Amino acid sequence: MITLTGHTLTIEEMKRLLLEGEGVTACPTSMQKVAECREVVEKIVENGKVVYGITTGFGKFSDVLIQKDDVKALQHNLIQSHACGIGDPFPEEVSRGMLILRANTMLKGVSGVRPLVVNMLLEFVNRKIHPVVPQQGSLGASGDLAPLSHLALVLLGEGEVFYKGKRVHAMVALTEEGLEPIELEAKEGLALINGTQAMTAQGVLSYIEAEATAYQAELIASMTIEGLQGIIDAFDENVHKARGYKEQVEVASRIRDILHDSKLTTKQGELRVQDAYSLRCIPQVHGASWQVLNYVKEKLEIEMNAATDNPLIFDGGEKVISGGNFHGQPIAFAMDFLKVGMAELANISERRIERLVNPQLNDLPPFLSPEPGLQSGAMIMQYAAASLVSENKTLAHPASVDSIPSSANQEDHVSMGTIASRHAHQIIQNVRRVLSIEMICAMQAAEYRGIENMSTVTKSFYHQGRQQVPSITNDRIFSTDIENITHWLKTNYSIKERLDVNAAL
């Protein structure tokens, strides 16, 4: 059970919450702050004070005063009218993350909701009732209005949820769990939907997958180094310390550890003086991607604990301030950066695939074919990798450079952060498939070189891979092989655990 405080949530805790289904509870001290802040809202309504989103309309309607008797209707109307999401739903892990992050931001005690609302969000998390939230429709400012409105709907007994493996109406799940839908009161609708929790939840899942995929890329690249009898000198510690990037040094160190007892690597001058960049520069390229990952993790952990709705209430109600913390620009930039960093792992992987299959670049059978000419072997696998890499290049175009004004030009600059976050996740799926192709080719090359000559780590990884796909002894439908390895990487390593050298042993 993980305790939410509004201030201390980490990526490691989110892994447990999203991927292992761990439950959550609220810190009592934080809940007391929620209750105290709610008293301020009640006084504002009772006194008829003009405060945006509490006693006024929204967006362009911020100058329209709302009568006391209409305050509840205002919040309900807000949720229904803003539930304009379209397209396929987010993965359940993302909608679960949205519930968690929305509760966590409310626990900062500046949003003005009742403790009841926070408790309802936590009930959904702990009972694994996950809102069906369409992926498209958010501009990323005023936060993720459309996606979060679909989240808010289910608290009211409206909309759909994923529950016990099925997609059902929210009331089906609520009834079975013995829960009553809530009725929103002043400010609560706005507090539920004004924030960055859709882009951030998707960003967290993307980061978790990206981190493990980056570790996998090092292990798979190490197998390729063996298959091509790569020069180990390029990974010498002195080379990488001379440049000074810690991530580059760490990648080189892990590859040295992976290959320390390999009989397939060579020294410079034995077979050739230098390797191609796709081998020699693995620490420089992969290390740079790790720099991106470290940056993204830092920004996500800030946003996970941020107050992102509007207005915010401070100093016991002395200050009720309209601001713009809902603007998703920090996450938009981070997700666009993640797209580029991960796309490069696929770019360099595809070049290693080419070196494994091109007979002009190695002494292996052409296209790793068991009978070149009659059988094409891995020829079209390289085509598939090239296609995925090119698709990533289009997806990597920064969403954050775009902005379209909305709400009659009141909201005249937006982040497009949710688009960036969604595209980052798509890129990571493509990267994993490219790496799967590289692994298939590297395993085949290892067989030609002699499996007994592989390092202890890569040999273990090879045997695990061969449990998923057989050797290429004849042409067959290779798309099945690619998907099998992709699924195996994702379910056994990618989002379940951090892969280090010992994980393959």
UniProtKB/Swiss-Prot annotation:
From the record heading this protein, give the residue positions of the covalent cross-link 5-imidazolinone (Ala-Gly): A141-G143
Entry's Gene Ontology cellular component terms: cytoplasm
Q: Which residues carry this modification: 2,3-didehydroalanine (Ser)?
A: S142
Q: Which reactions fall under this protein's catalytic activity?
A: L-histidine = trans-urocanate + NH4(+)
Any idea of its EC number?
Answer: 4.3.1.3
This protein's pathway reads: Amino-acid degradation; L-histidine degradation into L-glutamate; N-formimidoyl-L-glutamate from L-histidine: step 1/3
Q: Which CDD domains match?
A: PAL-HAL (cd00332)
What the entry lists under InterPro entries is as follows: Aromatic_Lyase, Fumarase/histidase_N, HutH, L-Aspartase-like, Phe/His_NH3-lyase_AS
Keywords assigned: Cytoplasm, Histidine metabolism, Lyase
Q: Name one Pfam family in it.
A: Lyase_aromatic
Q: Name one GO biological process term.
A: L-histidine catabolic process to glutamate and formate
Q: How is it modified after translation?
A: Contains an active site 4-methylidene-imidazol-5-one (MIO), which is formed autocatalytically by cyclization and dehydration of residues Ala-Ser-Gly.
User: Where does the record place it?
Assistant: Cytoplasm
Q: Which NCBIfam families does the annotation name? A: hutH, PRK09367.1
Q: Which family does it belong to?
A: Belongs to the PAL/histidase family.
**Protein name per the record:** Histidine ammonia-lyase
Per the UniProt record, the source organism is Bacillus cereus (strain AH820)
* Taxonomic path: Bacteria, Bacillati, Bacillota, Bacilli, Bacillales
Its gene is hutH
